[in-house]
Structure formats: C-alpha cells, structure tokens
Amino acid sequence: MKQAGYRCMGATMRLYQNEDLGQSGFHTCCSAKDVEDAAEVAFQLDIPFEVVNYTEDFREKVIEKFIATYEAGGTPNPCIDCNRTMKFDKMLDFARAHGLDHVVTGHYARIEQDPETGRWLLKKALYTDKDQSYVLYALTQDQLAHTKFPLGGMDKPSIRKIAEEQGFCNARKHDSQDICFVPDGDYVGFMERYTGKYYPDGDFVDLDGRVVGRHRGAVRYTCGQRKGLGLAMGAPVYVCGKDMEKNTVTVGPESALFTTTLVAGDFNWISIPALTGPMHIKAKARYRQTEQPATVRPLDNGLVQVVFDEPQRAITRGQAVVLYDGDVVVGGGTIL
C-alpha cells in the first residue's frame, strides 16, 4: 500500500492478556511476540505504529459469546465475531479517528464494487486454497467500502517471497490455525477457568432415548464427533444431538447425521440488499466444506431456510452458512 502511494499507519489489536486466560506458555495471535513483530515491520516501513487495547470489547463480544454458544449446545466460530466486531468495526473507527480512509488486512479475499448496482461485493481469493471469504461474510457495505485486501489476488508462496526480499521478521511465520485465545485446543478447560464453572458428567442416549453410557460434560461434544466418546456399541456411533437442559448427548449411526435443511438467523446480505424470494445458489455450512447447490427462502422474522439439493453431513448449530454465486458471497448467517 505504501508503494502504491497511500499514507499508511500500522496498528495491532491487544485483545486479551495471555496470563489472564491462563495461556502464558503459548505464542498466540495478538500475543506480545505478535506485537513486537508488527512494530518491527512498521519500523522497517517507516510508518507510525500503535497498539490498540480492545480487551474489554473482545471479552464481551467474542469470548463471552463463544462461551454462551457452547453452553446453549452450539459450536461457535469466534473468528467471524472477531472480524465483525473488532477488525472491521473497531479498527475502522480507529482509522477514521486518525484521518485514514481504509482498513487494510492480510485476509485472502477480494472486494469489488458492482458497476450496475453500486453495491460492494465480497469475492473469493484467487488463491482458493487460502480463501477466507467464509469468515468475512458479516462485513457491512460501509466496512467493505473502506477495507482493502491486497493479498486477495496473490498466492502464499509469492507473498512470503516478497516478505523475505523486504527482510521482514515475520516472512516465515507459521499460519495461525487454532482459536487465538484457546491455542491448546482445550476449549472446555478454558471455559472452566474463565467462568469458574464445572461442566458435569451426564448420559449418552441413543436415538430412542435409551441410556448407553456416560459422557464428561455435554459442552465437550459437537455434532458429527466420533473420537473420544468411549462407547463400545458394536458399531461406530457419532454425536447426533445434545439436550443442554437434561445434559444428555444423543449418539447414533453416521446415517443419522445427514439432512438437507437448515434455518439460519442474523443474516447479512452483501451482493443483494435482501432476499425477497427463493434463490438457487451454492452454500457451505462449515469453513472447509466445498459449496453445495441449494435453494434459499426467506422466512418470517428475518430467518432464512436453506435446502440443499443433496443431504449434508453434520450441519451444526452455531456455525455459519455462507451463500455463493460463483466466486461472489451473496450473504451468510448463523445456523440455528
């Protein structure tokens, strides 16, 4: 961006203190090491740099929602909430407060304006192996108009080569894979430390409601899970559902995981202002899934029904369903 003639400023968000979350032994995203790396790159580029403290907002809008979704029986995607409420909301406010027009990040996606409708479009990255459009579906028209993704048309090896040629300290830094505030993957342990709660054992039940074993707390299990159940039932069984009030986890054969229909709420439309009737598009209900043909229909109260042409495995409450028309994101919402 600096080479293109823009007036640039570097900024990184402090979203939590590792020690506060019991993660002092990990180098997570937004860690002290990340702040140091960002500051060094800004110094090399000869641009101003600030660390912005959003710890309280992050706790309220991301961490506490993450916990509430698990406690309600869903499986959250906190990266989507962080993008929606932190990176492209708080940081845009920060940019404007400093007289700057855009937030620029390293996400793999593209933004273009539709010359016919004037709407800002979110599109898949050209380097599809790294495409992140799924976790960016919640961006508003205002946010898209003031955001740039310069890496959206590039591939990862080329980007690393440029970073090495510039001598950036983070040129060979590993990609982040885990939830930033739960880097060890033990989200239940994190939740218990954070809330002071203990999530009690309960019953595994089959599809007919018969008790078939004991589980270690319903929050530990997600739809479609097979590993770690500790059940010997003569055939493989999978998590098919949870009743959080009764603290039961329903298990059954893999065939019970397949369904064609879901309902989603909290929808954000991007390429269209609203859904006014049935539309045949492609949709995916998890990050690593390939989009599948489906029909979407508007329901009352802003809800949306998605009916896939073919049954899909383990559609999970709390995850996002994102709709595509080719490489353009039509919109997305949270599975109910």
For each feature predicted by the language model, list its residue ranges.
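AMP-forming adenylation/ATP pyrophosphatase catalytic core
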Residues: 104-111, 115-336
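ATP-dependent adenylation/nucleotidyltransferase module used to activate substrates
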Residues: 1-137, 148, 157, 164
